[in-house]
Amino acid sequence: MDISCHKVASGHAIGPALVTHEAISFLGNVNPETGMVIDPAHELFGQSIAGKVLIFPGGKGSTVGSYVIYQLKKRGRAPSAMINLRSEPIVAVGAIISGIPLVDRVPEEVLQIECGILVEVDADRGIVRVLEPASGRLSA
């Protein structure tokens, strides 16, 4: 299944999906040394974002979040790509300075992709591709 998208930060990546319906504040929600979601109130608490295609509505919080994304990349703990419904400046700047593909303007149905399903993000071509068989692509 191919999904059209808008490029925010260039690049191409493939990885398992990690999906949340909640916004993410990289300063406070994510440990920059481990890539683990550390906010017990967040839907992804206890999960690692490292190497994942992180799918979330958008970012929130402090502008320091951009530098947390950069720290994650430098430590090898960053997501392989990010998909937002609507990107905002904090996540956009973090992705750009870190070289992490970031796309947005996707349908809300992307939030139905099951965690663990293999997803390809080709920001330069404006395509998100769900690579798993049709029988297990979207959750109910």
Pin down the residues of each PLM region:
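Feature captures the catalytic cores and cofactor-binding loops of soluble hydro-lyases/lyases
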Residues: 2-13, 18-129, 134
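Short, charged/polar, Gly/Pro-enriched secondary-structure boundary elements
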Residues: 135-140
